Amino acid sequence: MKKEVIYLTKEGYEKLKTELDNLKQKLMFEIAERIKEARELGDLSENSEYQEAKNEQGRIAARINELENMLSKAEVIEGLDTNVINIGNWVIIKNLETGEEKTIQIVTPHEADVFNNKISFESPIGRILVGKKVGEVVKIKAPKGVFKYQILGIKV
């Protein structure tokens, strides 16, 4: 049976690892302390502080499990080059109509964050850009129409 692999950039892997470490610390110390304090208040059946702490403990434990599962399947993408756009590359593109330049990073779906210009290689824009080279012009369909962009640069 083939093992499922989750590809991540080095930055994405480190971010998930840090989140995991922080959640483990929070679960071990902060939540355990809240549960202990809530127990000291008496009757647990009507103790909302206790129930809230236990619920948060469950949510954190589920996220820890999810992160551990992802990281166990993770393979960090290395050996990036700047000749062809691939996962992990930063890409400088220019809107040929407005002249606006934008820098985006092509990442895996687990790392995508449009507010920080991290675009999944599986997204419509990502699929168009992966494999392209500096100087090429691409057409990107957006809700407001079709836009032409020129690829100005590829960085690691």
From Swiss-Prot:
User: What sections of the sequence does the record tag as coiled-coil?
Assistant: 8-75
One GO biological process term: DNA-templated transcription elongation
Mind listing the GO molecular function terms for this protein? DNA binding; RNA polymerase binding
Record keywords, A-Z: Coiled coil, DNA-binding, Transcription, Transcription regulation
Q: Which residues form the signal peptide?
A: none
Name of a matching Pfam family: GreA_GreB
As for what it does, the entry says:
Necessary for efficient RNA polymerase transcription elongation past template-encoded arresting sites. The arresting sites in DNA have the property of trapping a certain fraction of elongating RNA polymerases that pass through, resulting in locked ternary complexes. Cleavage of the nascent transcript by cleavage factors such as GreA or GreB allows the resumption of elongation from the new 3'terminus. GreA releases sequences of 2 to 3 nucleotides.
Q: What's this protein's family per the entry?
A: Belongs to the GreA/GreB family.
Per its record, how is this protein called by name? Transcription elongation factor GreA
Organism of provenance:
Thermosipho melanesiensis (strain DSM 12029 / CIP 104789 / BI429)
